Amino acid sequence: MKYNFDEIIERRGTNSYKWDLVKEDGVIPMWVADMDFQTASCIIEALQKRVAHGIFGYTLVPDSYYEAIISWFSRRHQWKIEKDWILYTSGVVPAISCCLKAICMPGEKVLVQTPVYNCFFSCITNSGCEVVENELKRVGNCTYEIDFEDFERKCADEKTTAFILCNPHNPAGRVWKKEELERMNDICLKHGVKVIADEIHCELIMPGYQYTPFASISEACRDNCVVLNSPSKSFNIAGLQIANIICPDATLRRRINRAININEVCDVNPFGVIALQTAYNEGEEWLDELNQYLYENYQAVKEFFNTELPQVRVTRLEGTYLVWLDILPFELSSDEAYEKLMNDGKVFVNSGTMYGRKAGQGYLRLNIACPRKTLMQGLIRIARVLSQYMDEEDLSGCPA
């Protein structure tokens, strides 16, 4: 590889949310979704050049910003975006809130597919709306599929006005197929439900799978959705706070733009603008190598648990760098496992119940976007703790 993802870079003492939230020494953080790799060197160099200028006043967003987005999605994903569709903002979570305020009235219902990214819940409730769950169906202990009967039943409720899609899905690891996306949109259209597609992990795809932008599938999908994306996950630049709302429908776009301004998330900083342009114009080679390294990390996780502790069932990872571990065979709840791993194992993972009290029970979320040495140290600690709570009758691991 041209880029060294094995390099261990000290992040403690940098006010890192991932590393400095827990003050106790020796804890390996494998939780929140940022990576322990330096971003692409081209981005670092572009930011250094901007810093050298020394003046950091209010910034305009140039045409080259939009051109970078349009070019990237055209050549990487065969999705033709028009400049007018793009609204910039400071992050995908603020974007979700703005979209909900533009689409829903307080008291209405918003559908999500649990287990799912925990901020969806707070965005919905903070908008005065009610969370409705379409729980994904576990298949063969190793992956998930959509319960379409339940999905339509929830959409048919006249109070359900929006559906937040997670594609790729965090934490279930699915990269939804075109046919699945089309079927969901058909149901949403039938019942007047708008789709808000969170596609922030769209560049983090495992070999053999393909991300399909929701709005690229058909005119019907395009006209019924808002797509949210950002280079923050794929290029590890979340702290630069840059994201985009892609909304082809002009009427809805005006409402969202109004919500962005009302909620004062309409300004972005020059570093985010420069980082996005550089990532999309020059970062492709780095991203491809990153995905290869993440795939090797995922293979290492599967091999480790299949060999050392097969009772831990590793959910198939199609996209993201977040591995969903099934610990149902153990005599621990998700929250108990989280506490034991933190206190006894000194490894920080996410309890599955963050992503749905019912759908996430018996699971842990593991961030594998770290150097392999760090990953293996974390896995050893996890196995050492969980092995004390085994149900000896359940030895069923996932197929390799």
Q: What feature does the model see in each segment?
A:
Residues 56-186, 203-204, 211-216, 220, ...:
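Conserved core of the PLP fold type I
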Residues 331-333, 340-348, 355-400:
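PLP-dependent enzyme catalytic core of the Aspartate aminotransferase-like
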Residues 273, 277, 293-302, 314-327:
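Conserved glycine-rich beta-strand-loop-beta hairpin in the small C-terminal domain of fold type I
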Residues 2-91, 98, 279-282, 388-389, ...:
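N-terminal small-domain helix-loop-helix segment of the aminotransferase-like
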Residues 48, 152-155, 185, 189, ...:
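A structural alpha-helix within SAM-dependent methyltransferase catalytic domains
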Residues 45, 219-295, 303, 384-386, ...:
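Conserved core segment of the aminotransferase class I/II
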Residues 112, 133, 197, 349-351:
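Hydrophobic residues in well-ordered beta-strands that form the structural core
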